[in-house]
Amino acid sequence: MNRYQTLQKKLVPFKKGCFIPFIILGDPSIEMSLKIIDVLIENGADGLELGFPFSDPLSDGKTIQKAHLRAFSSKMNIYLCFEMLQKIRKKYNTIPIGLLLYANLIFKFGINNFYLKCFNVGIDSVLIADLPVEESNDFRKCAIANNISSVFVCPHDAKKNVIKKISLYSTGYIYLLSRSGVTGTDKKIIVPSLNLIKNLKKITEKLLIQGFGISNSKQIQKIILSGISGVICGSVIIKLIENHFQNEKKMLKNIKRLSRSLKQSTIIF
């Protein structure tokens, strides 16, 4: 049983959804990034979705683009990211940790080398934002060889043949897209249709986790009530980092409050 399955087993009987925050490693610095992760986990995060700083993050809106730049300003690179991941896994042995990255970053490092490194530092899953499932064969082979779960994005308007393929190849969880476009909290999100959720649940028992633009309790409650397993929230957290990173105490206090609120919203009474 992998960590996502363990999380699912823990949540389902109690009618709870999972809250998974997303941040960029090294934003705004290595030390502060590690403190942010501590605060998130201590205040409700059920898992982590983490990004490596990347020079051309096409799927990201302005808020997360700035996070990539702040991480680069703190001299982050792929090797320091793996060092951070090793520390995080050593401290938090039971929670699922996934990476959300871009294909070129992995390709430059060497696909098999990358997945081997992920295995060595205890990563559970890798989602490649700009990799269509139809072009994923080389990446999936290396993921399987190194015991890393693959995650693919399922659009809210996905056709049945796409749903089947994503359900088959996503071995960690299935990422449900709130809408098309780039990340950010300034656009309306879409809860996938009950028909899509029903079709997915017919063919898979994996966690269904929705991301992209989720920023408040009302959105989360609507998502969980629709039958989705949990949410990934990134921009709303990263905006707090952007606004307060020059005042660490205030930043961590605000992230603590937000994390508690977002987690509480996943619990259905």
From Swiss-Prot:
List all membrane-crossing ranges: none
Q: Which cysteines are joined by disulfide bonds?
A: none
| Keywords assigned | Amino-acid biosynthesis, Aromatic amino acid biosynthesis, Lyase, Tryptophan biosynthesis
Species assigned in the record: Buchnera aphidicola subsp. Schlechtendalia chinensis
A Gene Ontology MF term for this entry? tryptophan synthase activity
Q: What EC number(s) does the entry state?
A: 4.2.1.20
What residues make up the catalytic site? E49, D60
Metabolic or biological pathway, per its Swiss-Prot or TrEMBL entry: Amino-acid biosynthesis; L-tryptophan biosynthesis; L-tryptophan from chorismate: step 5/5
Give the quaternary structure. Answer: Tetramer of two alpha and two beta chains.
So which domain of life are we looking at? Bacteria
- The name this protein goes by in its record: Tryptophan synthase alpha chain
